[in-house]
Amino acid sequence: MQADFWHARWANNQIGFHLDEINPYLMRHLSRLRLQAGEQILVPLCGKTLDLAWLAAQGLEVLGVELSEKAVSDFFEEHDLRPEIDQLDGFRRYRVAGITLLQGDFFALQAEHLAQCRAFYDRAALIALPPEMRERYAGHLQAVLPTRSLGLLVTIDYPQAEMAGPPFAVPDEEVRGYYAGGWRIEELERGDVLGVNWKFLERGVSWLDEAVYLLERG
């Protein structure tokens, strides 16, 4: 899965993964990240999610990383924001009060970019990637995050043979395998969400679970 795939999805407005509401899991469980006002949270592969503005409204400093320039531009336009734009290493950096978006390749992210980061929130990053990229993504995320980080991770699971991703099925054992080294993993929620996901129903998926994890690096 190359960059051109995602650029084409955004160019053609094929963004079924974008939610027109704040993620309810985020609202329910943000407090578990134990963040204080002014502390920074990373949102990898953030798209133009409304969660960015909501997190900033909670008093946090939000750092999003997104490949698509259109997604980043759309976010600021739809929120009627006029960001300062400059370059930071290999990224185009967009900044307004409380929100910084780095437009570019997630794998170009370096530890110094996240030196002030306390936590991360992943709703649509891990599940957006095919198996061969997920391990690389999780490894790179852990390599650049500071020690003693926390994370809120949302995944889905379904019979992968019944539908081609994205979004991809990420079973529980896979999550625990990626974060086995030095992370405490707590499953906060798991539930059947097939009935409210028409895309999966139309494609004949027989079951669909959504899970939320709290990750803590000790």
From Swiss-Prot:
**Keywords tagged on the record:** Cytoplasm, Methyltransferase, S-adenosyl-L-methionine, Transferase
At the top level, the lineage of the source is Bacteria
InterPro entries attached to this UniProt entry:
SAM-dependent_MTases_sf (IPR029063), Thiopur_S-MeTfrase_Se/Te_detox (IPR022474), Thiopurine_S-MeTrfase (IPR025835), TPMT (IPR008854)
Tell me its EC number(s), please.
Answer: 2.1.1.67
GO BP annotations, alphabetical order: methylation; response to metal ion
Please state what class of enzyme this protein is: transferase
Subcellular location(s) of the protein? Cytoplasm
Which N-terminal residues, if any, form the signal peptide? none
Residue spans making up a coiled coil are none
Q: Which family does it belong to?
A: Belongs to the class I-like SAM-binding methyltransferase superfamily. TPMT family.
Descriptive protein name: Thiopurine S-methyltransferase
* Organism from which the protein derives: Pseudomonas aeruginosa (strain LESB58)
Task: Please state the gene responsible for encoding this protein.
Answer: tpm
